[in-house]
């Protein structure tokens, strides 16, 4: 049998909530160009991610990877903390 090569999406964003146990909410910001007017529009994506060791705080910049569904809303997993929140 041949094995499928799985490519996981990796996104970088800011932690906006860590109230749940072993879970964080990450906001990912991207800019898209309007097709007609050419103006860049800010689009945000809020993802729930699995934080196994509860090591993230609000304001941290993190990298998350897509994974199998962990719960009803969690389909992302924490890969690394890029930058800690100041203060």
Curated annotation (Swiss-Prot):
Keywords: Ribonucleoprotein, Ribosomal protein, RNA-binding, rRNA-binding. It comes from Dichelobacter nodosus (strain VCS1703A). This is Small ribosomal subunit protein uS17. Part of the 30S ribosomal subunit. Belongs to the universal ribosomal protein uS17 family. CDD domains: Ribosomal_uS17. PROSITE patterns: RIBOSOMAL_S17. One of its GO terms (molecular function) is structural constituent of ribosome. HAMAP family: Ribosomal_uS17_B. InterPro entries: NA-bd_OB-fold, Ribosomal_uS17, Ribosomal_uS17_bact/chlr, Ribosomal_uS17_CS. One of its GO terms (cellular component) is cytosolic small ribosomal subunit. GO terms for biological process: translation. One of the primary rRNA binding proteins, it binds specifically to the 5'-end of 16S ribosomal RNA. Pfam families: Ribosomal_S17.
């Amino acid at each position: 049998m041949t094995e499928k090569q799985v490519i996981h999406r990796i996104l970088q964003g800011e932690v906006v909530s860590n109230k749940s146990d072993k879970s964080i909410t990450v906001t990912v910001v991207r800019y898209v160009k309007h097709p007609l007017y050419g103006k860049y529009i800010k689009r945000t994506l809020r993802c729930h991610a699995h934080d196994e060791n509860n090591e993230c705080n609000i304001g941290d910049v993190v990298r998350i990877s897509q994974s199998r569904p962990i719960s009803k809303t969690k389909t992302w997993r924490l890969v690394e903390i890029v930058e800690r929140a100041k203060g």
